[in-house]
């Protein structure tokens, strides 16, 4: 797609990509932008009741998104690709401080980060949570705890996973194959079989979503 968009492109090819199939052009390759575009530019294609970026919560969502990215979404990568023990130690500390704070926030039983309304903040968090025990915990060495060791976060993740539209997007085999194919971190290319708990959860959620 990158060379179709620009014949002589020689840079990195990253995902996700939003591609215009009619114009044969790349619209955007930044996940945060694409997420917000789905909520605005494609409003006519989604139910009117869904608004992942409501005006009254916009400032709070922006603050949460900024914090999530720096401490957790990107934090796991800082740990996984750290080139020194000091950098790794700092990154891992930040990751688990963030998870500890999220555990406290979600311990009041709220279904979503902002309370009773599903927002883009939940989507941003979910994509890291669903990958954590499967890939980040082992491959990125963020192994102080698993998501399964955080009762409130685990319950929150399961609630999101039980939303059919979300469950249908999860493919643990693809997640594991993608991450464990990173030669710098896993030279053998061996893909682990587990963990069984999350596989069973995803299997049940996808069955209910069918």
In which residue ranges do the predicted regions lie?
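C-terminal alpha-helical interaction module
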Residues: 1-210
């Amino acid at each position: 797609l990158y060379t179709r968009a620009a014949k002589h492109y020689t840079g990195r090819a990253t995902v996700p990509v939003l591609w215009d199939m009619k114009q044969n052009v790349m619209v955007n390759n930044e996940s945060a932008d694409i997420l917000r575009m789905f909520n605005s530019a494609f409003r006519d294609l989604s139910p009117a009741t869904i608004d992942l970026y409501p005006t009254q919560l916009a400032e709070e969502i922006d603050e949460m998104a900024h914090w999530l990215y720096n401490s957790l979404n990107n934090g796991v990568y800082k740990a996984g690709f750290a080139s020194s023990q000091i950098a790794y130690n700092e990154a891992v500390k930040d990751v688990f401080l963030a998870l500890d704070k999220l555990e406290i926030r979600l311990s009041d039983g709220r279904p979503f980060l902002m309370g009773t309304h599903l927002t883009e903040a939940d989507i941003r968090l979910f994509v890291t949570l669903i990958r954590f025990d499967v890939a980040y915990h082992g491959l990125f060495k963020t192994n102080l705890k698993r998501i399964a060791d955080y009762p409130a976060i685990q319950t929150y993740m399961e609630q999101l996973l039980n939303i059919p539209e979300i469950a249908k997007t999860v493919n643990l085999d693809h997640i594991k194959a993608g991450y464990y194919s990173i030669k710098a971190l896993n030279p053998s290319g061996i893909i682990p079989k587990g963990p069984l708990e999350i596989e069973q959860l995803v299997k049940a959620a996808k069955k209910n979503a069918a």
